[in-house]
């Protein structure tokens, strides 16, 4: 949630993009409600990673979590240093199995959560994959490669911004590794780098 939302201006000059209402509800509220439905169990905590949006926005997000019977936690990403860096900001909430969702993506979370796997990434075919992180799959549907915003075509399966991890701790180990070793793509710490490391280790 820490981005500036420039593509939705002028609306985002006064309201952060995830809080813009769609059919009467903020985007982020619809997203967490959908995820709560497919999780199939009570959600203990919803952590929001935001920019400097102010106390009113923070309180709105906490109320969204509380409506679902969950604790709401707020973390601030002071600099836009990438998706992995954003998750690092919420490290204190990263325990056990987790769902990570990018709240500024306009889609409905209509899927089945398969908790048998170590991790699940939801993808969608797109016409212009150069604007997204994409995955390459083998014949069995398993991921063979992650590519962040490819400039030449490698796949049209874009990562839509929802992930499930059975072990948040394993993910954090990889995020800490890439940050401690200053491994960047496009000047930022990318989640896809951590995911590729996990894939190579058989996760």
Feature names for model-found ranges:
Residues 1, 50, 102, 123-124:
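Short beta-strand/turn micro-motifs composed of small residues
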Residues 4, 104-105:
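Active-site metal-binding loops of divalent metal-dependent hydrolases
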Residues 5-10, 130:
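Short N-terminal binding/cap micro-motifs at the start of the first secondary-structure element
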Residues 7, 13, 20-21, 25-101, ...:
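Conserved N-terminal catalytic core of the sugar/cofactor nucleotidyltransferase
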Residues 28, 90, 104, 125, ...:
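Residue-level signal for inorganic ion chemistry
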Residues 83-85, 129-134, 155-157:
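Short, charged, surface-exposed secondary-structure boundary motifs
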Residues 108-134:
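Conserved donor-nucleotide/metal-binding helix-loop-beta segment in metal-dependent transferases, i.e.
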Residues 142-203:
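Catalytic-core segments of class I nucleotidyltransferases/pyrophosphorylases
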């Amino acid at each position: 949630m820490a981005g500036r939302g420039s593509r939705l201006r002028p609306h985002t000059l006064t309201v952060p993009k995830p809080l813009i209402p769609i059919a009467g509800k903020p985007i982020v509220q619809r997203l967490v409600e959908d995820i709560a439905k497919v999780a199939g169990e009570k959600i203990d905590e919803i952590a929001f990673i935001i920019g400097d949006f102010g106390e009113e926005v923070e309180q709105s997000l906490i109320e969204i979590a509380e409506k679902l019977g969950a604790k709401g936690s707020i973390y601030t990403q002071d600099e836009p240093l990438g998706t992995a860096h954003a998750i690092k900001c919420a490290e204190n909430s990263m325990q056990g199995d987790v769902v990570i969702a990018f709240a500024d993506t306009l889609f409905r979370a209509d899927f089945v959560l398969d908790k048998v796997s170590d991790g699940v990434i939801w993808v969608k075919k797109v016409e212009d994959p150069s604007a997204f992180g994409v995955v390459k799959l083998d014949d069995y549907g398993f991921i063979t490669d992650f590519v962040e915003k490819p400039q030449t075509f490698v796949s049209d399966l874009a990562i839509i911004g929802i992930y499930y991890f059975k072990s948040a701790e394993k993910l954090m180990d990889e995020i800490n590794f890439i940050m401690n070793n200053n491994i960047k793509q496009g000047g930022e710490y990318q989640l896809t780098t951590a995911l590729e490391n996990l894939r190579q280790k058989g996760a």
